């Protein structure tokens, strides 16, 4: 695997990069051998009100999982993201907003964003929200979503952002679990030309008899669409901020005061409210942003993630703003109204750094050159990928077509629970291999272990664990520390278990193979679904694939592949045989799919993650309990897949 084609560091990157290979090695060694010294120094990336004396105080020990960083220091996140930039860079653009409709866009300076955040902070205080209260934010991708988040941080309220694609049931569950006192929403959201009934969803969520904590709903007017109104409870955003003062002194917060709760789907039971605190989280978000994207002042940065996901928290807002960057916020989708929309936005705003997801990349790849038609993308310097392992074919297409063969691709592996990047290239320090997340970030100590938790050395494959803490690590699950310990620290003692499997090659590069529960065991051989999917997608006629295991009398598990073809391609018996032979040739006979299920679309969450749990159930013919489908972008896909399944002959 180490013999795979390596992409060397381009000269234009090497000439001005923040970290070169020698610096990476020296800094990484210090970060794991002397974490107090290293993180004590790196913590200075922020402005502290009371400087910290203690740096690291952490334990992964069974029954005593405790994570504290900079615990005697005080600061305010919003002051670090706004106030400290005003004197020298107040007129610099903080947020470029690009609407769903390309004719709508605006630039908001640091000065203007600071004013809006102070006004909304005063509004929250007027509504009786105080330090420690939880505020639910259910908004579209508009600047006011950022204003609401920063205003919460400014007064010390804990925000719980709920992705705008979630159903009323999902919204209610998150409000109940966090006891939110206030909900901030919009009349409607806009996405790919369609309106999304956000206020109606909130109204429906609040009808749940178990929602008892909410006192008010603040509503932003985005479309002017018709909505129901409950006097006394519902309040217009514009009415409130008009009367609010633009003067506000940011609240002094302890580094370990809660900053936000973000719910992530559990494979079983209710969603998990991942809790991040203020100091360590922001140090880590700022430092990873600066070094992984090789950020230079003046760069225009675009992260396509929604604020409802951790990527939107750390790398659309907090990391970039802490560094004084210009961050682009996009309301739309990358391939609407034309497949070239993403490339058009890059050209329009002269984007230098683009961070998006493999799902978007594969969707554009299926369109071929239409995805870049009429654009030159010459402003781009760095590309990034997030959300799932990227298959080498999509990586190469992204590098070649979007980045004109000159932009390093930082393939970042991390999770909601990690707060920031864990395994990732650094543009000036890492030679790249398509499909590999490469090397750990500073302070991150990954290891591969076998099923008993024994460390595996050298080039090998196993479960990916982290053996010591890092500042961005989640501190607990909201209101359920026992579940936190059970979920992340009980599988392997004294280690954080990511739930992912990985392979390490001869160069020490890590290749994420997917969730450990996405590893198939075919005739005693372990096969990562990501590897089979990658082979399928490498076929010139295939746009997307998802592979699951189904029970098999002889092999233990058989391979069931859902396959979406490129536009203009049609399924046929000949293609069926061709695709099976293709995988056999790419990986070996063991990996040959037993079943190919042709389909137009896969069940995905709004963030583009494929819901494999549902695919496993459908493939196995188990439709008794498909679980929570409220997070699906298009719940109708499930019915369609079930219908298609009826016509498929299953292996015995």
Curated annotation (Swiss-Prot):
Q: What is this protein called?
A: Acetyl-coenzyme A synthetase
Q: What is its EC number?
A: 6.2.1.1
**Modified residue N6-acetyllysine is at which positions?**
609
An example of a Gene Ontology cellular component annotation for this protein is: cytosol
An example Gene Ontology biological process: chemotaxis
Instruction: Give binding positions for Mg(2+).
Output: 537, 539, 542
Task: Give the matching CDD domains.
Answer: ACS
Q: Which SUPFAM superfamilies match?
A: Acetyl-CoA synthetase-like
Its source organism is: Escherichia coli O6:H1 (strain CFT073 / ATCC 700928 / UPEC)
The record's listing under Pfam families reads: ACAS_N, AMP-binding, AMP-binding_C
Q: Look up the coiled coil feature and give its residue ranges.
A: none
- Cofactor(s) it depends on: Mg(2+)
The UniProt similarity line reads: Belongs to the ATP-dependent AMP-binding enzyme family.
Provide the binding site for ATP.
Answer: 387-389, 411-416, 500, 515, 526
Q: Which domain of life does the protein's organism represent? A: Bacteria
Q: How is it modified after translation?
A: Acetylated. Deacetylation by the SIR2-homolog deacetylase activates the enzyme.
**Keywords in UniProt for this one?**
Acetylation, ATP-binding, Ligase, Magnesium, Metal-binding, Nucleotide-binding
Q: What class of enzyme is it?
A: ligase
Reaction equations catalysed: acetate + ATP + CoA = acetyl-CoA + AMP + diphosphate
Where, by residue number, does CoA bind?
Answer: 191-194, 311, 335, 523, 584
Functional note:
Catalyzes the conversion of acetate into acetyl-CoA (AcCoA), an essential intermediate at the junction of anabolic and catabolic pathways. Acs undergoes a two-step reaction. In the first half reaction, Acs combines acetate with ATP to form acetyl-adenylate (AcAMP) intermediate. In the second half reaction, it can then transfer the acetyl group from AcAMP to the sulfhydryl group of CoA, forming the product AcCoA.
- One MF term in the entry's GO annotations: ATP binding
